[in-house]
Amino acid sequence: MQEFSLWCDFIERDFLENDFLKLINKGAICGATSNPSLFCEAITKSAFYQDEIAKLKGKKAKEIYETLALKDILQASSALMPLYEKDPNNGYISLEIDPFLEDDAIKSIDEAKRLFKTLNRPNVMIKVPASESAFEVISALAQASIPINVTLVFSPKIAGEIAQILAKEARKRAVISVFVSRFDKEIDPLVPQNLQAQSGIMNATECYYQINQHANKLISTLFASTGVKSNSLAKDYYIKALCFKNSINTAPLDALNAYLLDPNTECQTPLKITEIEAFKKELKTHNIDLENTAQKLLKEGLIAFKQSFEKLLSSF
């Protein structure tokens, strides 16, 4: 399916040297993403970083982090470069800016430009969280011809506004990362069974429609947070349900591997807006508003990435 791309939402040194290459070589994935939580998990729990950390002892914590993280990003970039050279819409790896800068546009812009210049790779995307300062940051990076991944997008309204900016100003590839499964984790305990495991897909589909109103060949919806939070769902539930044209799904390894055992042969037709509106109306009878939930999940997501980054830095 040329219209749909699968990326890997995982990064870790041993993985990059082994299974990551296998996934690329067999055509299973054509991109990858990282975030502060993934780096925290990898660096604090994997033995493959310990010798390097020991050699960096005495340096500032953020300097140690960047030395380790940028090495991984460069390795992923090199592995994905043949895909990028064949088709500049594919073959990207994402690196997120310091999550503690999310409310400071100027510092966010400076850090993003510094990281992109340091890495000096055309297939690196700089990740920017969809905080209040994001619009200024996105605009500046787009004008600087930096590939962008706008992350922690929960609201269809925000998704559309971001797409509008990128449609006007993006000179390089850009994706808008719409988070999915966290909606179901939040809402399912509050609704009857017939409404469960649907909120994430409904909201993500509405985001997809909003983005596509402005999307061009440089801009795509990227569905993220697509690992299931419930044992009752198939591991690849969110990949299969959101297999839309001109979209990307970045998935954790368990979801990715499950999907590859039985992949879709063609893209899904998205739910109609009328179906989404009917579902939202049904949710409101249970005092649930998806836009309010989106705002709550964004705040929690920003906090979670800060906590992971702080935990990682303190481990040094």
Swiss-Prot record:
One of its GO terms (cellular component) is cytoplasm. Pathway: Carbohydrate degradation; pentose phosphate pathway; D-glyceraldehyde 3-phosphate and beta-D-fructose 6-phosphate from D-ribose 5-phosphate and D-xylulose 5-phosphate (non-oxidative stage): step 2/3. InterPro entries: Aldolase_TIM, TAL/FSA, Transaldolase_2, Transaldolase_AS. GO terms for biological process: carbohydrate metabolic process; pentose-phosphate shunt. Pfam families: TAL_FSA. Keywords: Cytoplasm, Pentose shunt, Schiff base, Transferase. The active site is at K127 (schiff-base intermediate with substrate). Gene3D superfamilies: Aldolase class I (3.20.20.70). GO terms for molecular function: transaldolase activity. NCBIfam families: PRK03903.1, tal_mycobact. This is Transaldolase. It comes from Helicobacter pylori (strain J99 / ATCC 700824). The lineage of its organism: Bacteria, Pseudomonadati, Campylobacterota, Epsilonproteobacteria, Campylobacterales.
